[in-house]
Amino acid sequence: MAIKAEEISALIKEQIENYQQQLAVEEVGTVTYVGDGIARAHGLENAMSGELVEFSNGSYGMAQNLETNDVGIIILGDFETIREGDKVQRTGKIMEVPVGEALIGRVVNPLGQPLDGLGEIKTDKTRPVEATAPGVMQRQSVAEPMQTGLKAIDALVPIGRGQRELVIGDRKTGKTSIAIDTIINQKGQDVICIYVAIGQKESTVRNQVETLRKFGALDYTIVVTAGASQPAPLLYIAPYAGTAMGEEFMYNGKHVLIIFDDLSKQAVAYRELSLLLRRPPGREAYPGDVFYLHSRLLERAAKLSDELGGGSMTALPFVETQAGDISAYIPTNVISITDGQIFLESDLFYAGTRPAVDAGLSVSRVGGSAQIKAMKKVAGTLRLDLASYRELEAFTQFGSDLDAATQAKLNRGRRTVEILKQKLHAPLPVEKQVLILYALTHGFLDSVSVDKILHFEQDLFDYFDGKHADLLETIRTTKDLPDTDALDAAITEFSEMFAAANNSGDSAKEALEKIDNA
């Protein structure tokens, strides 16, 4: 084959015409120290705070300390194969996580990588883990209820969509159970739930995921987990990653419930990183910006204005106390940031009152305006009545001479405590909560012995489901009480049957069947 000089000449001319003088400028530094999830690098002169950097082994890190001679970096991945002298380069980006519908029903780590063995997550959408919270004019007042399905919370310390409500208590007082029950209760409510597990045992998270799957709640839930065995940087960014995933739905007009379980462990991880990065320690060895750590996270939960789509993100941060001390550093910080707190008391929990909500120390600052009318009417003074009952109960230990009014208050208080008890993973629809609280506050339970209260409740629900479903439907659709005469008549009829059944030894259900057959 003959080589033609003209063709070679034309090719050379084409190459010369297409030649562009380009220089790729990359800022590369050298690792001078690595260990315990952090690294120091020299030579990244123009690195920005929070910027993503890439190590030669493919791991990423986030620039945290910008000092004269070097940059302190937290490593988001495998740091055991990084060596002193390795190269590290800037990416010019901040950290982002995958977001979108593809994450629903999945278990992921804080980097958005799947942990459930169900294959890769097919989404091309990402959001930065750190984002500016909505401003004052981008928000609106909390006005819609976020029903937890727990009588003790929906009646005493109601939560609204877009609210931040702290759940605080010692270990093993039922904080996580409240989270799981609240998620289960969102079934059919068009709410996306995000459960962020920080520093928990892998076996515990597995049990929670299986519980959600069993009740069909995983169909609308994203689980973000940074286990106890994970490096501190992953525990630190886990809540921000979960919030970024929630913001994608919130800014598209949807309603989101995000649960941080728990922020105490995140604060401990941040303290560890700060001390390793040689930042000056403050109270309890936490760094000076530990308040900002949580405030910038929780401020991202909001009820957006109608101009922005009217979406919302409700945050339930959890904080663990030591021996019930809510005046410690992290608890007081988070209490001051949130719109109220639900305090779980270990003494109540071990006495069998579950959920162990302490009515005296728990408060919801904005949730009252989100309660439905029916619940406001039946539960208006319930929290104060319960708190005064606790005080009276303490005084009665000193003497037995009680006037009739005090005795009546004590009797009503004992029945209130019993009614607010609830089985695990059995959230109640709001219309049934209203029904039993109406029966309580209008004296229908005063003649029922305390040990029969929960039987009365269950049989009352069965009776109304079978005979007066229209009254329950009225509460559900109108959000208000039905005709009180009809409601009183129905409850009175059931109460008489229940009393007769107790006298004959039948259950109320059996008595009802006998009446139907007759």
From Swiss-Prot:
GO molecular function terms listed in the Swiss-Prot or TrEMBL record: ADP binding; ATP binding; proton-transporting ATP synthase activity, rotational mechanism
Alphabetized InterPro entries for the sequence: ATP_synth_asu-like_sf, ATP_synth_asu_C, ATP_synth_asu_C_sf, ATP_synth_F1_a_nt-bd_dom, ATP_synth_F1_asu, ATPase_a/bsu_AS, ATPase_F1/V1/A1_a/bsu_N, ATPase_F1/V1/A1_a/bsu_N_sf
Oligomer and partners: F-type ATPases have 2 components, CF(1) - the catalytic core - and CF(0) - the membrane proton channel. CF(1) has five subunits: alpha(3), beta(3), gamma(1), delta(1), epsilon(1). CF(0) has three main subunits: a(1), b(2) and c(9-12). The alpha and beta chains form an alternating ring which encloses part of the gamma chain. CF(1) is attached to CF(0) by a central stalk formed by the gamma and epsilon chains, while a peripheral stalk is formed by the delta and b chains.
Keywords: ATP synthesis, ATP-binding, Cell membrane, CF(1), Hydrogen ion transport, Ion transport, Membrane, Nucleotide-binding, Translocase, Transport
Top EC class of this enzyme: translocase
EC number of the protein: 7.1.2.2
Superkingdom: Bacteria
Lineage: Bacteria, Bacillati, Bacillota, Bacilli, Lactobacillales
Coiled-coil ranges from the UniProt annotation: none
A Pfam family that the UniProt record links to this protein: ATP-synt_ab_C
NCBIfam families assigned: atpA (TIGR00962), PRK13343.1 (NF009884)
Gene name, Swiss-Prot/TrEMBL: atpA
CDD domains named among the record's database cross-references: ATP-synt_F1_alpha_C, ATP-synt_F1_alpha_N, F1-ATPase_alpha_CD
Keyword RNA-binding among UniProt keywords: no
Protein name in UniProt: ATP synthase subunit alpha
Stated family: Belongs to the ATPase alpha/beta chains family.
GO cellular component: plasma membrane; proton-transporting ATP synthase complex
Annotated PANTHER family: ATP SYNTHASE SUBUNIT ALPHA, MITOCHONDRIAL
